[in-house]
Amino acid sequence: MKSQTAESEKSKKYDRQIRLWGEHGQAALESAHVCLINATATGTEALKSIILPGVGAFTIVDGNTVTGEDVGSNFFLDSASIGKPRAQAATLLLMELNPDVQGDFVEETPENLLEHNPGYFSNFTVVIATALQEKTLLTLAAKLWDAGVPLVVCRSYGFIGYIRLQVGEHPVMETHPDNVLDDLRLDRPFPALRAFVDSINMETLTDKEHSHTPYVVILLKALDEWQQQNGSQTLPKNSREKDALRDLIRKKVRVKENRASEPEENFEEAVKAVNRSLNATVVPREVKELFEDEACLTITAESKPFWVMMRALKDFVENEGDGALPVRGTLPDMTSDTDRYVKLLNLYRAEAEKDVQAVYRRVQQLLNTIGKPEDFITEADVKLLCKNAHAVRLVRGRSLAAEYDAKEAQVHTILTSLDSPDSEIIFYVLFRAVDRFYNQYNCYPGYFDDQLETDISKLKASLGQVLQEWGSGPVARDDYVHEMCRYGAAELHAVAAFVGACAAHEVIKLATGQYVPLSNTFIYNAMTAASETFLL
């Protein structure tokens, strides 16, 4: 009884987010262990936004002690913490946000950990990195790339924010697309649906039954009549044909005894649904591309569960599905009496379950072939894929090593964007120049007030070096160089809070396997409240 009460309280606590990613998404988040490297203002804001939703555990790796500068920009450090280990101080205060979350800290620099315990970071679900020098960042990124652990790099620098997501192969079965067409199969009704629609004689219905007939029935009957009139088995393709179908539906509105044609909401819904519900049942291009991927075509003992399921889905489409994906088993809201709506809904659900079982059988056959246990992939996994097969996506990211390699860098994208005066790419280039400056002088430009003018000249030189490596001439952006030096690498809390929250969104996407992560670089300009993403 106590356990049930605890679960009920937990559901109430996380109710709003469970509506977004479901109980299974919440369970995935609660099983995640996130590492934060360096408890900067941006880093702790990112942790805050994943601790509040209930991430399972977090660990802060930081070898620094708290300074007055830290306290001035970081809400999760106070004056009593000055001189204490920053990892410990931040962990203790962050843990107060949510007693359900486990917190830990390591008082060690990431450089030291990478040198003496290089596999340490491979044990986390996601790693968030802040305030790392370029050399350390690239070393960490390479190890995480090889280990298959996602890395989220975030940074706030004056009025500018930056997020870089490094993830190798990341399948997303629940993408939650904004605009989804109904999956009613009206162009190819399955036997149970056809029998249900044919069993309803609209002429013999009472007025009440007539005005409460689900629009799916009205639409399919009208489509049958339209196809018969036109000698075709296809769907209406152009506006003229769709208008003709709408006219057919409107003519079916019953004229009452007083000879007045009263509005019937279900018929109005049928007219509106011509565009939304009368769509061809096809396999989307993105899903076809996954079917033709070498990882899908060649299943081995090393294949990941996602690819085994995709191969089973491909085989289903080519066989039982007759060229179509599994039925989703959902039905939109509509004007209808309860009895017929429930019957119709159960028909779709039964057909969806039949398709799930067909795909699951194929999954089991594949697992048996490659010598994997049956529970390697559960029926629930297959059901989730079948329900979302129309929108499944695979993210294949680029490594930081490729981005920083002059031969593999997306130079064309960068230089083309630089030609646009409104593009935020200039700040990405300046971040690269700032890191080059730090590597040369062991401090950030503008950090010391008395060296500001000298640093401006030095940063211009660093910027020129970066551009030269990309085969570009100098860029006349002196005002931006001055601005970066004026920042002096300071973290403004308002910017850090925004960037940290955005980084937390990406961590949650990765941990839950839902929603498509950004690809792959995000720049935020707080001066103009503008942001832009780039694939770098």
Task: Outline where the language-model segments fall.
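Adenine nucleotide-associated cytosolic modules
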Residues: 1-536
